[in-house]
Amino acid sequence: MSTIRLGTASPGTQPTTAATIALIDSIAQRAASSKIDILLLPEAFIGGYPRGSSFGCQIGGRSEEGREEFAKYFDQAIDLGDTVGPGGGGAGLKWVKRQIGDDSDVVRGDGSREELERIARDSGVFIVTGCIEKTGGSLYCSVVYVCPKEGMLGKRRKVLPTGSERLIWAQGAPSTLRAVSTIIRGVRINLAAAICWENYMPLLRQTLYSQNINLYLAPTADNRDAWLGLMRTVGVEGRCFVVSSNMAVPKETSESLPKRRRRDSTITEEGFEIALPRSPQRARRRKSVFDEDGNEIVLCRDVDGDDGDTQTSPPVFTSTIPEKTEWISRGGSSIVSPYGDVVAGPQWEDPDGLIYSDVDFRDCIRGRLDLDAAGSYSRNDSFKLSVEGLELDPLPY
């Protein structure tokens, strides 16, 4: 049975949506050069997670400055050509199949869907990314599943934004919790995403388990230490592989400003890495690298203090962040096995690197020898779960 390489990263949203999508293109090419099959990127990566913003809102009042801030945030969201749909569910499979309206040949939206499909197709990487989607005057915190062969297989919208997120994001319908399925090198992978604190909703988790998923994706904005424990619980509970991705975002202050440096290498159109000559002005290198299994290795320093050159595999770039940096979000992306073992990460304070792990999806079946949360262990003769607008039929392996 072929192994599948799962990968994730902790990049931060760029100043413009076009720049963020261009970054996805770059990350996908790097992922392809590292032979990653499926890549997860963070919650709200396209459009941005407005951490710390209040949008001028308080109980009983909204400011003009806040309205303008929201208008600018709205501009950064992408239009994927979907409808609002019942309860915020969109058009579902009609959107996937481009069957909205009378003419299926008409391109809907702002072209973001087509660009993401191109990136997946060119890189050969199955991409799952968080995005802020706009339609009908509302914003949704969404996730798209982009297959390199078939394009977008599905899209879902966060059913309950957390806390103050409800000021700016509408509720998505639970019908969008539909899992999708793909086959990579003969391995059937059933995957679905739970966004951030949806992972603290037991019935939502059970909704995903009930569709017989073996890959559970958790894009998030939570960088608390407790998050990894939750991901390990999900792995054991669902007997599935779990991939989580969160942005690593440095705090931009006069004392701690991210200084963007050039890369140690570049990726050609064919996916080959070309090492670039080292600039004499650069003296700092990474403190760690990741090996072929996705494990982090701490690098030693020379006694005389000269760091020297860095050679890494997979392609790793010189850190763009000063040592004394404060972080708005520390990242923490990780990959967990069906037995709750952390097989890659957590990736802290590293917006540039990739982490990955080679996995055997038959481990999900082996784990169900003693625990099948959506099978006999669910005791569905005694406990009933129904989801509005969604049939909980298990996908085949």
Describe the function of each predicted region:
Residues 12, 53, 159, 249, ...:
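A generic structural motif
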Residues 247-397:
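C-terminal beta-strand edge segments of enzyme domains
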Residues 129-131, 141-145, 178-179, 244, ...:
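Short beta-strand scaffold segments in enzyme catalytic cores
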Residues 17, 29-149, 222-224, 228-236:
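Cys-nucleophile CN-hydrolase/nitrilase-fold catalytic domain and related Cys-dependent amidase chemistry
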Residues 45, 132-133, 200, 221-223, ...:
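Catalytic metal-binding/acid-base residues of hydrolase active sites
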Residues 1-38:
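N-terminal active-site segment of His-dependent metallophosphoesterases
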